[in-house]
Amino acid sequence: MAIIISVTNFEKEVMQSKIPVLVDFWAEWCGPCRMLTPVIDELAKEYAGKVKVCKLNVDELSDVASRFGVMSIPTVIVFKEGKVVNQVVGAVPKEKLAGIIDDLLAE
């Protein structure tokens, strides 16, 4: 299960993480975001312990979304050591996100 990001845990869960973090920026009203939800949940299970998978509701944390330039949702941003290393906009196939994670883990 993906970690739900809040104003109180963003720094700890994402910016200070010792392992890479995939963050799904989404909203309840966003149809493509809902399509991506099962993909995000599968990635969380498959990469447990290797990559942290998180969900951030842009309606609740619009300041964080703005901080990272999120203009469209869903947007998936991958962080490593507190820095953005990849970003994908739109409801993309699981294989694309898995490929990004695999490439990152191979570094």
Regions found by a protein language model. Give the residues of each.
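Proteins that catalyze or organize thiol-disulfide redox chemistry
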Residues: 1-52, 60-107
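Conserved residues in the N-terminal Rossmann fold of short-chain dehydrogenase/reductase
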Residues: 55
